[in-house]
Regions:
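First exposed extracellular module after export/assembly in secreted or surface-exposed proteins
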Residues: 2-8, 13-16, 20, 106-107, ...
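Active-site cleft segment of glycoside hydrolase catalytic domains centered on the general acid/base Glu
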Residues: 3-96, 121-129, 163, 202-218
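Active-site beta-loop-alpha junctions enriched in small/polar residues
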Residues: 39-42, 85-88, 113-118, 146-149, ...
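Glycoside hydrolase catalytic-domain groove-lining segments
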Residues: 57-80, 90-158, 172-188
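Substrate-binding cleft of secreted/luminal carbohydrate-active enzymes
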Residues: 142-144, 164-225
């Protein structure tokens, strides 16, 4: 969040006007050039409640709807997404996102599941169950930030063959479930969150252990996956 937002000192009405102007200007500027937007990102707590942020505090609990309305008005043809993490593994959080989408059927075109996952979680059973609920919205489905941790607890000392095979199988599982569960008309796609392991956000924001979450090694070496 930029400092002009976090350090805003005006009234709530002035804050709303500033955010509306920002959303309108950005989306209008790229109208016809940008096909889709993640309009609101990471708005829910793990229990499905709304996170307390400067947006909820100053714009009210319905701030998500407001921002989608402004984006929709600025570019009626763009695909508008709600995006969040742990939707693929946390049923309560997924239900909150789905309820948001169902309450705003003309404003929200799709749901982005970030998919920062590990070899162990989510299981295929859990992912299949949640995907059934997500697909039932009838909206576009995007696996928006996929990467797969292989060393979340520090037990893996190197990227050996067994680890590579396990990661390959997990990537295959994810793609297989996506294709099996999401009808062709609802498939927005799968985005891998980076190319090389060395450039992964998990190098600096993970659990502090070395990891190898992407499809290419540090020097662009092909992986089995």
């Amino acid at each position: 969040v930029p400092t002009w937002v976090t350090n805003f000192t005006g009234t709530n009405a002035e804050f709303e006007a500033a955010i509306k102007t920002y959303v309108t200007n950005v989306v209008t500027h790229y109208k016809g050039k940008v096909a889709s937007w993640d309009v609101v990102n990471e708005a829910f707590n793990e229990d499905g409640s709304l996170r307390s942020t400067i947006f909820s505090q100053k714009l009210g609990s319905n701030y998500i709807t407001k921002i989608f309305q402004w984006a929709r008005a600025a570019d009626p043809n763009a695909k508008l997404f709600y995006n969040d993490y742990n939707l693929e593994s946390n049923v309560n959080k997924a239900k909150a996102a789905i309820a948001l989408i169902n309450a705003n059927p003309t404003l929200i075109d799709g749901i982005g599941l970030q998919m920062h996952i590990s070899l162990a979680s989510p299981s295929a059973t859990v992912l299949n169950t949640i995907m059934d609920k997500v697909v039932a919205t009838g909206k576009l489905v995007h696996f928006s930030e996929l990467d797969i941790l292989v060393n979340p607890t520090g037990s893996v000392s190197s990227y050996d063959y067994a680890t590579a095979i396990a990661q390959k199988n997990k990537y295959k599982e994810v793609f297989t479930i996506y294709k099996a569960k999401v009808p062709a008309t609802q498939r927005f796609g799968i985005t891998i969150w980076g190319m090389r392991d060395v450039d992964s956000w998990l190098k600096t924001n993970g659990a502090g252990f070395p990891d190898f979450p992407l499809l290419f090694g540090d020097n662009y070496e092909y992986k089995i996956a």
